[in-house]
Amino acid sequence: LEKLSVLLTWSEHRPVIFSSDSEDVISPEEMDRSIVESLGNLPEIQKFHLTNRIRTNAELSSFIQNMMHLPEKRSPRWYPHIAVVYANNDREVENFLNDFAGQGYQQRMPEGSGQLGIQAVRDAEKIVVLLDEQYYYDEKGYLRSRCSAEKYSSVRKLFHLLNQAKESLALVVRENMAVYEVMMEILQMHRNR
């Protein structure tokens, strides 16, 4: 809070812009939300909440939002830059990943092993991601993970990872027919109208 008071002193003489993202912290110290909360309670502070379309285009953003939480209203949308394929085993996964790599896609790993922190800052035109049996949809239509015992949810990691794609996104769904069927339903929403 000492650093906050220094910044506030500066702000008396000139405009100061603060930015925070509690879901994408760089260091453990940033987990402390007291500074952000203190800023939010100050008089004459203007808050702006950014959308999820910071990096991705509208098509990818719409698909990712629908994937994270199934919409109650199915609005027509065409997703020409999204590919979803189903793999029955590891050999098929490898074949699909190699095929997408040949088309210029960069593979991203959804599970943490320390790699995500490095990947989180690297956007790419085309990304391919593996979704395995850990993912499922709950009764309210939210994508969930059976491996979310960590502080930072696997689904939240996946969300940030998917948003690294700038133009095209490919999903390889391994041995998870329920999630694959939902993905196909999202892709075909525009045909239902």
Task: Show the residue positions of the predicted features.
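Conserved helicase motor core of SF1/SF2 NTP-dependent helicases
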Residues: 1-101, 109-193
